[in-house]
Amino acid sequence: KEGLAPYIAETALRNLYLGTGIKEEEIEKYLKQFIKDLPGYIEDYNEDVFHQSGTVDAGAQGGSGSQGTTPPATGSGAKPATSGAGSGSGTGAGTGVTGGQARTGSGTGTGSGATGGQSGSGSGTEQVNTGSAGTNATGGQRDRDVDAGSTGKISVPKLKAMSKKMRLPKAKAKDVLHLDFLLTYKPQQQDISNTRATKEEFDRWYDAYKKEYEIDDTQMTVVMSGLMVWCIENGCSPNINGNWTMMDKDEQRVFPLKPVIENASPTFRQIMHHFSDAAEAYIEYRNSTERYMPRYGLQRNISDYSLARYAFDFYEMTSRTPARAKEAHMQMKAAAVRGSNTRLFGLDGNVGETQENTERHTAGDVSRNMHSLLGVQQHH
């Protein structure tokens, strides 16, 4: 009701904050007091509802909510066939009396009738039957005749993306593939590529790196950004060592590379592949403010600065990479690794011989490796 403020009962508050529950006696007290103080409020919501029953003519057209029955009309003369009352539309007009019922209808208008001393109101359908021909006038529209020259709606058939008829791998006469799953399985290429470290490996490297530097996550974001820019310029070869640097305004900060390389698994370049998109966007941003080409591209002598965004060695090629960019990146990679010689085995540190020498020599022997030759001396 208007003018009444919202109210929360004490029992509701106890149930909300204490969970004590509500008893029927408490609700009954509130209801009695409510009826006593606001009788008009209760009366407005105690409305009586009446339902009217009747027989619906399923063949009636042109109206809604018609009451009564409509028997078929036969014979000659004008004879209405609707009991009850209603309004409708039709052609012509007619009057009739059947069994003490009076009915008057017009082409477009309303009609009223009485049956057994009871009157009703509503909307219905007027029907006028004249002569043996039995002309029927209805308020609704007639069904459209079927035109032999018309054509139906033609739809283009949709082919299935994967047919059941294709040959699939089977195990014990059962398919081993789930076709419905394949239709919705569209992972990112980078997430399942074996050239990029898994998320678990990256998390392990990140935690070990942070632990070695003894910094928090907020400081790590700054350090990781500086490391990415340093790798754009200097590459991410696993053979690099020493320190890496980043600038703090005009001051140069030096960080050791040992924890960066040692904790990278499988390789440092596979770790850095996670930074590929960010590095590409950074190079593009630098080129929007100044001419910028990473050192990796300067060594390859690239003259087209539009390819600068691909000129770093941990760039990750995808299906969206343009063909010209892929060719340029592969040529740069081929030039970078040209002349490199990777040995599977290095020099074995165990160079001592394990063979035991059992030869016995004396001072009279000719040499260390030769026995006496009957007094012959060997001079060097």
Swiss-Prot record:
Query: Record's family?
Result: Belongs to the potyviridae genome polyprotein family.
As for PTM, the annotation reads: Genome polyprotein of potyviruses undergoes post-translational proteolytic processing by the main proteinase NIa-pro resulting in the production of at least ten individual proteins. The P1 proteinase and the HC-pro cleave only their respective C-termini autocatalytically. 6K1 is essential for proper proteolytic separation of P3 from CI.
Top-level taxon of the source organism: Viruses
- Under the GO molecular function aspect, what terms does this record hold? RNA-directed RNA polymerase activity
Enzymatic reactions: RNA(n) + a ribonucleoside 5'-triphosphate = RNA(n+1) + diphosphate
Answer yes or no on keyword Plastid. no
Q: Does the keyword Mitochondrion apply?
A: no
**Composition bias type Gly residues, residue spans:** 85-99, 106-123
Listed GO CC annotations: viral capsid
Q: What is the originating organism of this protein?
A: Maize dwarf mosaic virus (MDMV)
Q: What is this protein called?
A: Genome polyprotein
Q: Which InterPro entries match?
A: Poty_coat
Pfam families found in the cross-reference section? Poty_coat
Instruction: Name the residue ranges with Low complexity bias.
Output: 67-84, 129-140
Cite the residue spans of the region called Disordered.
Answer: 54-154, 349-380
Which keywords, in A-to-Z order, does the entry hold? Capsid protein, Nucleotidyltransferase, RNA-directed RNA polymerase, Transferase, Virion
Q: Where is this site: Cleavage?
A: 52-53
| Enzyme Commission number(s) | 2.7.7.48
Which of the seven top EC classes does this enzyme belong to? transferase
